[in-house]
């Protein structure tokens, strides 16, 4: 038993030598610093163990004072020692400050591994985007979430009209999803006041972001400050700072204004557009897309969460031109008033139409497993599974079980399964590209 414990301790000690921790270099620097300090001190005090070293120094530098050489060596050693000590402490404190779970070594390794992960840009809105972020934050820390700002309903809509701020609801959900202490932050940000004049119906997170926006001067700075306070992995950006509102034209020629009104007509949507038409993309969003290794569209409401971002021409154009791998996560079920009877190809064609390009994505991720009892329950409510029609799709089709195991019978994407499927496809695509070269 004692031997096993000893072996375990030795194994844990050996883990400090694993590649990727970026801490061994500072240990080596501390060791070299200590060595230089020791040698310099021995030369300065003329100790016998360095007799041969002193003889070499005298021959090489006959006109230089030996004590001066000793002091220089000691100074170099002191600088190396304290630099290594400082960097080691900063590395460890960085992990401790993040409130990461697990022991220090595991947290350090996880943080370093995530810091070297792919640069991912996730574009969308609503609950779909926050679900996705919960999964991909376990793959990389290099995340940029681009959030639509067309929401005009509920608490977000009221704050937008009364305070003149960008709708904070979807932004709030994304910040909570990327926070280290996700459960607590989500409960806090989602807390909705049930009483109180002016407060009733508002969520704490929406009010928090609105207050920060008032203090800092704009929503981007408010998001940045709240992200720092909550130690989130990655960053969250609105797609535009313009007061963007959505409008839809239906197949019968009628037009409706406002995101919350679009599904209510229960008509087939011909096109979606923004008011004003030429909204300007945030510069940081464009820079992130250009620098991305992987761009993910969806999941989420096709016409009110995903496509609104592509109506900003700069964003759509940059996604099309981007060298990154690009994948669309298709919804599992149809959405009443938006995508009734839609096939997977209908989703893709709607994206192409509004982005003005059929080069928008390289692949589509679809769910391939749905229990009959779940499908029947949703069918009674007017929702059908989005059926795959591979013959009409001209990009890679990735079929995986994506639904979350639910005792309540709810059809929801599993953040873990979606993130894993996307990452496997991304790595496979990288290997294919290398083989071609």
PLM features: what roles do these ranges have?
Residues 238, 242-301:
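Active-site gating loop/helix substructures
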Residues 102-116, 280-286:
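A short, basic/flexible loop-to-alpha-helix module at the beginning of a structural domain
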Residues 2-19, 341-437:
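C-terminal functional extensions of proteins
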Residues 302-312, 374-382:
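Glycine/threonine-rich flexible loop motifs
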Residues 309-316, 342-347:
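Charged helix-capping and loop-helix junction motifs
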Residues 127-133, 155, 304-311:
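Short glycine/serine/threonine-rich phosphate/pyrophosphate-binding segments
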Residues 2-99, 148-266, 423:
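Electropositive, gly/pro-rich neighborhoods at or near active sites that engage anionic ligands
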Residues 140-141, 322-326:
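A short helix->loop->beta-strand "cap" motif at the edges of active sites that frequently abuts
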């Amino acid at each position: 038993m004692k031997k096993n414990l000893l072996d375990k301790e030795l194994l844990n000690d050996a883990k400090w030598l694993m590649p990727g921790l970026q801490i061994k270099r500072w240990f080596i620097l501390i060791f070299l610093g200590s060595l230089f300090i020791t040698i310099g001190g021995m030369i300065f005090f003329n100790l016998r163990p360095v007799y041969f070293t002193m003889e070499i120094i005298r021959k090489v530098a006959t006109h230089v004072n030996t004590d001066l050489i000793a002091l220089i060596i000691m100074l170099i050693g002191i600088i190396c020692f304290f630099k290594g000590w400082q960097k080691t402490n900063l590395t460890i404190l960085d992990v401790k400050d993040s409130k990461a779970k697990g022991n220090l070594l595991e947290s350090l390794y996880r943080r370093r591994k995530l810091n070297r992960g792919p640069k991912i840009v996730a574009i969308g809105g609503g609950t779909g985007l926050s679900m996705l972020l919960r999964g991909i934050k376990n793959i990389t820390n290099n995340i940029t979430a681009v959030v639509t700002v067309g929401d005009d309903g509920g608490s977000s809509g009221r704050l937008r009209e009364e305070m003149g701020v960008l709708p904070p609801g979807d932004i709030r959900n994304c910040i909570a999803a990327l926070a280290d202490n996700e459960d607590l932050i989500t409960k806090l940000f989602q807390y909705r006041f049930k009483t109180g004049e002016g407060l009733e119906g508002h969520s704490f997170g929406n009010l928090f972001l609105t207050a920060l926006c008032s203090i800092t001067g704009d929503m981007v700075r408010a998001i940045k400050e709240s992200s720092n306070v909550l130690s989130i992995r990655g960053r969250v950006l609105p797609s535009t700072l313009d007061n963007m509102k959505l409008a839809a034209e239906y197949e019968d020629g009628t037009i409706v204004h406002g995101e919350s009104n679009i599904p209510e007509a229960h008509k087939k949507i011909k096109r979606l557009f923004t008011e004003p038409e030429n909204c300007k993309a945030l510069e940081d969003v464009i820079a992130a897309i250009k620098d991305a290794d992987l761009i993910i569209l969806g999941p989420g409401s096709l016409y009110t969460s995903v496509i609104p971002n592509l109506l900003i021409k700069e964003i759509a154009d940059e996604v099309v031109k981007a060298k990154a791998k690009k994948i669309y996560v298709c919804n599992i079920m149809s959405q009443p008033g938006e995508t009734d009877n839609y096939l997977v190809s209908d989703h893709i064609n709607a994206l192409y139409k509004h982005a003005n390009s059929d080069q928008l994505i390289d692949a589509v991720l679809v769910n391939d497993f749905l229990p009959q009892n779940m499908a029947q329950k949703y069918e009674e409510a007017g929702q059908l599974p989005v059926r795959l029609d591979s013959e009409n799709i001209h990009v890679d089709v990735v079929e995986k079980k994506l639904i979350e195991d639910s005792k309540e019978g709810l059809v929801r994407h599993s953040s873990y399964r979606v993130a894993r499927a996307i990452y496997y496809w991304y790595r496979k695509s990288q290997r294919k590209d290398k083989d071609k070269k």
